[in-house]
Design a protein with these regions (language model features):
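Extracellular, repeat-based ectodomains that mediate carbohydrate processing or recognition
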Residues: 1-227
Length: 227
């Protein structure tokens, strides 16, 4: 589970991490702006991405936008089940999406994990991906979901869209975990529960949330050799 991130910010760096400085409140996520000369811009011990406390915050992911603002995603246990929350920070470190952040989805699945954030600068699009634990025909599985945010608005509905796709009769035989995200290219690890193999798949998705022209609906298997 990644506990820290660093992303480029102008000529400087944004450091994002989780720590337990308040042991009775669980892990919390903090950030700091680090200048090229080694100086810092914010409080000496960093600034929290949310004022929510008392439940673990983990697995931070972030991307810097063209206006030097930052979109972050993390796993937050404040609700009954671990779910992903979002925050938008301006170039001065101010919280733009409220002091407590906003939930990634309106629905509350059993679990969300593996958040990833990427920015497509030429279209001013923020892409987010994650693993969603849900019931399919009475069986619980992880599948990969995605969301695109543009002009502060979710473009793929309140709960995003399912990225990892299989024919109806095959859904039960696969489980997927989000791996990497680069702009609108989603990469995940697929576990075949019948063959007991694991493979890496990649899929390009257009701005409407549809599989990009020329790409298979189920994604492109990067290698035919199991991992």
């Amino acid at each position: 589970m990644p506990s820290n991130r660093s992303v480029r910010y102008e000529q400087d760096v944004v450091i994002i991490w989780q720590d337990t400085r308040f042991a009775n409140m669980g892990y919390q996520i903090f950030f700091q702006f680090l200048n090229s000369d080694g100086s810092i811009d914010l409080e000496p011990n960093g600034r929290p991405v949310t004022l929510s406390t008392g439940a673990n915050q983990s697995n931070p992911a972030a991307a810097v936008l063209s206006d030097d603002s930052i979109v972050l995603a993390w796993v937050d246990a404040r609700d009954e089940n671990p779910n992903i929350y979002l925050q938008h920070l301006d170039a001065n470190g101010n919280r733009l999406w409220g002091d407590y952040g906003i939930p990634l989805t309106e629905s509350i699945p059993i679990e969300q994990k593996n958040p990833r954030v990427s920015y497509k600068a030429d279209q001013n699009q923020v892409y987010i991906s994650w693993s969603n634990y849900e019931s399919h025909s009475g069986n619980l599985r992880f599948y990969v979901y995605g969301q695109m945010i543009q002009n502060e608005q979710k473009q793929w509905g309140p709960d995003g869209i399912k990225i990892s796709y299989y024919p109806e009769e095959e859904f039960l035989y696969h489980e997927c975990s989000q791996n990497e995200l680069k702009e609108n290219y989603f990469t995940w690890q697929d576990a075949n529960l019948i063959e007991f193999t694991q493979s890496i798949f990649t899929k390009k998705v257009d701005a409407n949330g549809q599989t990009a022209q020329g790409w298979p609906e189920s994604g492109l298997q990067v290698s035919t050799y199991p991992i």
